[in-house]
């Protein structure tokens, strides 16, 4: 449809796995096999519960026959109804139903336990896997896709597994059991009942096939409407600024009308299934009643057996319906399991070397030696990068967006490995260190601040959980954060909400800087560290950073070139290559790429 936005998170009404057979094998082999004894207990009690329930109508039919014979006998001058015998039958029936209920409870308890244990294991496996995946994986996947696996897919697998396995067992047992009971009562009446079943399912299949496309449209348009609501809510200020309220309402109404049409048709067709089943059920009921009456008049069958057969006949269709519904549920469950296993089978980050180099005693000399790198093999973005950095130097990396500045820092910390060449720290290839120890050498302040829900103190201590309160306060003072923290309610113990919306963007940046200061790293990385802070705060930060960077190798990535004038070396990057290098004054004298960048920013500042 022209102009239609792509659905956010829309999925078909019934999902199908690409390879359901293989996914089922993995689910059994890697997870369900560990619960084989619980599943066996569940199977035994599920079958037992179903069997006791199935026998009920037959026993109730015996009571009906006894009452009928008693009434007929009374009329003909006999003894009448034997109530003690009827009571015995009813007590037996009550006992069977009580046992069936108990068995059902054990079966439900056991299956729920298995499903929740499976959910627990899967969540743990996914959580562990996330920390093993290379950064390249997260470049290919959105946060929403990963969150959907952790939440929606695992929940769907757990819930559907709990319901589906139980329903499959009970439905199959019920169908077989009822069929056996019907055959023991009357083969002729059973054949009459079975003739109606395929006819009813043929009609229902046509209705389901017709309604399915409308369910698909309903899901799609629901996703469009939800997406519009989300966009309109998050961007309502912009909508009002540009006077787009009417246009937004028109667009919403268009999709909402389509949702109404598809939802109405799908629900209407879906609602036809019960009347159709009811109609054919009544037809079967009439046929069985007429035939049963005839057979009873001939003395071939008892009245109680007719009553039992009618009850079995009405119960027979229900488990068949359940199995048809379960098949769709199983498809969705296996599709969810397939996505989970696909995630768990992703390649892990390359393992650390066994004979790793210790970081003890390293001072921070860094060398980039003919480094080539691309996020994909066919698109190299860093070409033959060479640079030598002495310990304690302040190195600024500048260049236009997409020049490869941030990528160089990611390579330095081994978020990615180079395609060719080497990155050395004090003469050792970064691949020769354990990743954990290598990254502990660095302190990083990112452009996008990240704080978790918790106290300000805990956020500052994130990189050094055993830090004392005095150390936390000293770090906050060095980052010029102590003053504003003390003005907040509860000071260092104030809780930051989930989105850190109760403090300003500049305050967030100050806290992340304090967090880095507390870890006392050997190598410092500032990625746009002051880009979102006001001028006064930036001056305070710059002063604190200058003190922090003394004696430490420091890499600064910034678009605002005024913040890196005092750098020992400025590397100017463009399209993955270093095209200029030198101090601020030397690069201005060259009147090259850097000078043009600096002058353009200076002119913008003047304007």
Question: What residue spans do the PLM features occupy?
Answer:
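Membrane-integrated ABC transporters
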Residues: 1-53, 68-89, 107-111, 115, ...
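Short intracellular "coupling" helices and adjacent cytoplasmic loop segments at the cytosolic face
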Residues: 4, 9-16, 116, 124-148, ...
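An intracellular "coupling" helix at the cytosolic face of ABC transporter transmembrane type-1 domains
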Residues: 29, 33-36, 135-136, 154-161, ...
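Alpha-helical segments in transporter systems
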Residues: 29, 37-62, 93, 108-112, ...
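Transmembrane helices of ABC transporter permease
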Residues: 34, 38-51, 62, 93-96, ...
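ABC-type nucleotide-binding domain
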Residues: 79, 352-353, 359-607
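Cytosolic ends of transmembrane helices, especially the final helix of ABC transmembrane type-1 domains
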Residues: 221, 244, 268, 285, ...
């Amino acid at each position: 449809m022209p102009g239609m936005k792509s659905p956010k998170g829309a999925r078909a009404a019934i999902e199908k796995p690409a390879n359901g057979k293989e996914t089922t094998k993995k689910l059994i082999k890697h997870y369900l096999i560990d619960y084989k004894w619980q599943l066996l207990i569940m199977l035994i009690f599920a079958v037992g519960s179903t069997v006791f329930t199935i026998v009920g109508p037959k026993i109730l039919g015996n009571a009906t026959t006894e009452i009928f014979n008693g009434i007929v006998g009374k009329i003909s001058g006999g003894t009448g109804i034997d109530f003690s015998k009827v009571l015995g039958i009813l007590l037996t029936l009550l006992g069977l139903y009580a046992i069936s209920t108990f068995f059902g409870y054990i079966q439900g308890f056991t299956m729920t336990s298995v499903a929740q244990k499976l959910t627990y294991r899967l969540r743990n496996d996914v959580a562990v896997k996330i920390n093993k995946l290379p950064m390249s994986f997260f470049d290919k996947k959105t946060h929403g896709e990963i969150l959907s696996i952790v939440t929606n897919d695992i929940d769907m697998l757990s819930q559907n597994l709990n319901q589906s396995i139980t329903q499959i067992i009970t439905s199959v047992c019920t169908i077989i059991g009822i069929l056996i009971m019907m055959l023991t009562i009357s083969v002729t009446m059973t054949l009459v009942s079975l003739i109606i079943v395929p006819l009813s399912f043929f009609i229902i299949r046509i209705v389901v096939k017709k309604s399915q496309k409308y369910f698909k449209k309903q899901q799609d348009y629901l996703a469009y409407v939800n997406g519009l609501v989300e966009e309109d809510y998050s961007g309502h200020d912009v909508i009002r600024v540009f006077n787009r309220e009417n246009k937004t309402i028109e667009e919403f109404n268009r999709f909402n009308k389509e949702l109404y049409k598809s939802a109405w048709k799908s629900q209407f067709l879906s609602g036809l299934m019960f009347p159709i089943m009811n109609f054919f059920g009544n037809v079967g009921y009439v046929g069985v009643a007429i035939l049963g009456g005839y057979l009873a008049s001939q003395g071939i069958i008892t009245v109680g057996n007719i009553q039992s057969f009618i009850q079995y006949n009405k119960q027979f269709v229900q488990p068949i319906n359940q199995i048809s519904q379960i098949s769709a549920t199983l498809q969705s469950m296996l599709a969810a399991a397939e996505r989970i296993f696909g995630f768990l089978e992703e390649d892990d980050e390359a393992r650390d070397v066994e004979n790793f180099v210790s970081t003890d005693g390293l001072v921070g000399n860094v060398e980039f030696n003919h480094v080539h790198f691309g996020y994909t093999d066919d698109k190299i973005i860093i070409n033959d990068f060479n640079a030598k950095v002495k310990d304690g130097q302040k190195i600024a990396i500048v260049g236009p967006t997409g020049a490869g500045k941030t990528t160089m820092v990611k390579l330095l910390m081994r978020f990615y490995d180079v395609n060719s060449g080497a990155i050395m720290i004090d003469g050792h290839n970064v691949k020769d260190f354990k990743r954990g120890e290598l990254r502990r050498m660095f302190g990083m302040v990112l452009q996008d601040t990240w704080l978790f829900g918790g106290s300000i103190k805990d956020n500052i201590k994130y990189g050094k959980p055993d830090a004392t309160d005095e150390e936390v306060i000293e770090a906050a003072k060095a980052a010029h954060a102590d003053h504003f923290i003390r003005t907040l309610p509860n000071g260092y113990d104030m809780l930051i909400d989930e989105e850190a919306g109760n403090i300003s963007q500049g305050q967030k940046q100050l806290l992340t800087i304090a967090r880095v200061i507390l870890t006392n790293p050997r190598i410092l990385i500032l990625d746009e560290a002051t880009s979102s802070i006001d001028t006064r705060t930036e001056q305070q930060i710059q002063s604190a950073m200058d003190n922090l960077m003394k004696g430490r190798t420091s890499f600064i990535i910034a678009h605002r070139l005024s913040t890196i004038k005092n750098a020992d070396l400025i590397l100017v990057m463009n399209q993955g290559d270093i095209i200029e290098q030198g101090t601020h004054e030397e690069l201005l004298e060259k009147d090259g790429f850097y000078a043009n960048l600096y002058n353009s920013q200076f002119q913008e500042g003047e304007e």
